[in-house]
Amino acid sequence: MEKIKEFCDTISNELGHGYKENIYVQAMCIHLRNENYLFRTEVIVPIIYKEIQLGYERADIVIYHPFKCILEFKAQNQALSNKEKIQLSKYKKNLNIDNGILINFNNNNNKLEYIEF
């Protein structure tokens, strides 16, 4: 997953900060395609209660090969908080994927935040 960090650093350095989240997702997709990763964007994450689907959320990117991992992007003005970590934890549980990465292209201080768990 070190390669994902490298992609994030490249995007941060070359594209910069201040764009909406979907711009960074698209930039990451360019890197993933160029490296022949198997992935999908906007993956449906079902919310199940007592075997009934109540609704769904969407994970930004799910990588299936060469490893399984959920990438969740943010472009917010504040640092990542427990709220975002909880969101990614739910996605990991509901999609049965062990690895996840939170990526924040912080618009306030032009700093990249990268949390792998």
Where is each model-derived feature located?
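Active-site metal-binding core of divalent-cation-utilizing nuclease and nuclease-like domains
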Residues: 20-68, 109-117
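Conserved catalytic cores of phosphodiester-cleaving nucleases, focusing on short active-site segments
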Residues: 16, 59-77, 91
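Generic secretory/membrane-interface signal
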Residues: 15, 54, 66, 98, ...
